[in-house]
């Protein structure tokens, strides 16, 4: 990391540098835009361009000072058409008071005053100059300054402040937006001192896949009781109703005895029926025979 050109109070801590490296903010693309060459540290043997983390931090502080200089936070517009940055811009807007455009940028937002979504911001911040090219183009028409998260292959035309970082990873995008929001709040005085920790976790700025969250909830609901525990005791505890089944088995024996009694009752009916019915037809036969002979 090159020596910092900032005042000592703005120097990053070792934890800040570790977070930038852990989120892979220093890993750029294989292509290199000529205007991004000053932010390049070196090129790896596999062709990946490595970004100078010191330059990244300097540009984060510079962008935060520009944002804090605007009196009305609602005059700042943060934009992200890239899905990995949509959650980050919404959180940034919630914490700093800016206006967020997450998702598709409607053409004419800055130039067509007839539309309902017409805006006149004093500053815009975009996640990727390539995916947010329409917003940058319209900002150039109406002289709006642009701050952008730029990778080594990002076009820098009409970009006033480029923050060199990896703008394709979910963690790198979320971390840079989180650091930018924290620095803005520090300059505004919302955070008491630079030594004080911000109570907002960086995880809130990371992208989350809705389908993955739904699948995770479905898996947790489908788990059997005791499946998370280890050992035979957990399984026995999970199927604690086995004793109830044994009791019901005893009850089933009572039902078996009752069915045997019913079967015995059926046998007595069978025994009674042949004697009664066999005797009755015989008697009837004798009466008919007797009456017939008497008449004849």
Curated annotation (Swiss-Prot):
Key words of the record = Cytoplasm, Ribonucleoprotein, Ribosomal protein
**Alphabetical list of SUPFAM superfamilies matching this protein:** Ribosomal protein S2
Keyword Ribosomal protein listed? The answer is yes
Function as written in the Swiss-Prot or TrEMBL entry:
Required for the assembly and/or stability of the 40S ribosomal subunit. Required for the processing of the 20S rRNA-precursor to mature 18S rRNA in a late step of the maturation of 40S ribosomal subunits.
Q: Which NCBIfam families match?
A: uS2_euk_arch
Family as reported in the entry's similarity comment: Belongs to the universal ribosomal protein uS2 family.
Protein name per UniProt: Small ribosomal subunit protein uS2
Species of the source: Botryotinia fuckeliana (strain B05.10) (Noble rot fungus)
């Amino acid at each position: 990391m090159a020596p910092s050109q900032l005042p000592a109070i703005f120097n990053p801590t070792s934890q800040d540098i570790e977070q930038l490296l852990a989120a892979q903010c220093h890993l750029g693309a294989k292509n290199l835009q000529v205007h991004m060459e000053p932010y390049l540290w070196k090129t790896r043997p596999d062709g990946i361009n490595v970004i100078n983390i010191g330059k990244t931090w300097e540009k984060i502080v510079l962008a935060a000072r520009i944002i804090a200089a605007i009196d009305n936070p609602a005059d700042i517009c943060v934009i992200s058409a890239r899905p990995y940055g949509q959650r980050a811009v919404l959180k940034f807007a919630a914490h700093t008071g800016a206006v967020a455009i997450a998702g598709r940028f409607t053409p004419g937002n800055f130039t067509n005053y007839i539309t309902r979504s017409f805006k006149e911001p004093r500053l815009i911040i975009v996640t990727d100059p390539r995916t947010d090219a329409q917003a940058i183009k319209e900002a150039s028409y109406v002289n709006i300054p642009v701050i952008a998260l730029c990778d080594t292959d990002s076009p820098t035309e009409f970009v006033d402040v480029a923050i060199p970082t990896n703008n394709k990873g979910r963690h790198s995008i979320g971390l840079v937006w989180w650091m930018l929001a924290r620095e803005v709040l520090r300059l505004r005085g919302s955070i008491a001192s630079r030594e004080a920790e911000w109570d907002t976790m960086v995880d809130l700025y990371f992208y989350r896949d809705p389908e993955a969250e739904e699948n995770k909830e479905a898996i947790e609901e489908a788990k059997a009781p005791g499946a998370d525990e280890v050992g035979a005791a957990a399984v026995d505890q999970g199927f604690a109703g086995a004793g109830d089944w044994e009791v019901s088995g005893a009850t089933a024996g009572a039902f078996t005895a009752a069915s045997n009694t019913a079967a015995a009752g059926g046998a007595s009916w069978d025994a009674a029926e042949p004697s009664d019915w066999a005797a009755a037809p015989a008697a009837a036969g004798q009466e008919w025979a007797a009456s017939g002979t008497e008449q004849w």
